[in-house]
Amino acid sequence: MKVRASVRKICEDCRLIRRRGRLMVICSNPKHKQRQG
């Protein structure tokens, strides 16, 4: 899980979702998991 100020899609499988008021990226590739900090 990468914590970043700006999250963006890295590949086609990446999905932007909002969880508990935070923007997150979920993907089939675990390296692409991100959360806005």
From Swiss-Prot:
InterPro entries (alphabetical): Ribosomal_bL36 (IPR000473), Ribosomal_bL36_sp (IPR035977)
Superkingdom, taxonomy of origin: Eukaryota
Main location as per UniProt: plastid
Annotated compartments: Plastid, Chloroplast
Gene Ontology CC: chloroplast; ribonucleoprotein complex; ribosome
Any Pfam family hit: Ribosomal_L36
A single BP term in Gene Ontology: translation
NCBIfam families assigned: rpmJ_bact
Keyword presence, Chloroplast: yes
PROSITE patterns noted in UniProt: RIBOSOMAL_L36
Protein name per UniProt: Large ribosomal subunit protein bL36c
GO molecular function: structural constituent of ribosome
Record keywords, A-Z: Chloroplast, Plastid, Ribonucleoprotein, Ribosomal protein
Stored PANTHER family: 50S RIBOSOMAL PROTEIN L36, CHLOROPLASTIC (PTHR42888), LARGE RIBOSOMAL SUBUNIT PROTEIN BL36C (PTHR42888:SF1)
The UniProt record lists the keyword Ribosomal protein: yes
Residues making up the signal peptide according to the UniProt record: none
Family membership noted in the UniProt record: Belongs to the bacterial ribosomal protein bL36 family.
